[in-house]
């Protein structure tokens, strides 16, 4: 465009069909689709592949008997179904899906790791 975004070109992944549509803004959601298949049967994930952490591990335990929370204590906020393994950012269920939130969760994960190490 002339100094600002005027249109975007969209391509259908299945058909390959392209179309140009008018647009003044563009928001990129890179983490909107988690790529966590490699974690299947390792940590608990929802039906969309987002990693379940913290208190959600305990409240959703009846739905996922194959990966129950194994300890008597409650999981730390970013802890996965594997004690001492943490998830942060867009890959985590119910995260904000924003860069600033992901950065904050990364810092929070460090604090969770320190808490975990103090417990062991």
Sequence positions of predicted segments:
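Short, proline-enriched alpha-helix->beta-strand connector loops that line the catalytic pocket
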Residues: 23-24, 81-83
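A Rossmann-like FAD-binding core segment of flavoenzymes
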Residues: 1-59, 63-71, 115-119
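A conserved FAD-binding loop/helix module that cradles the flavin
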Residues: 66, 71-82, 88-120
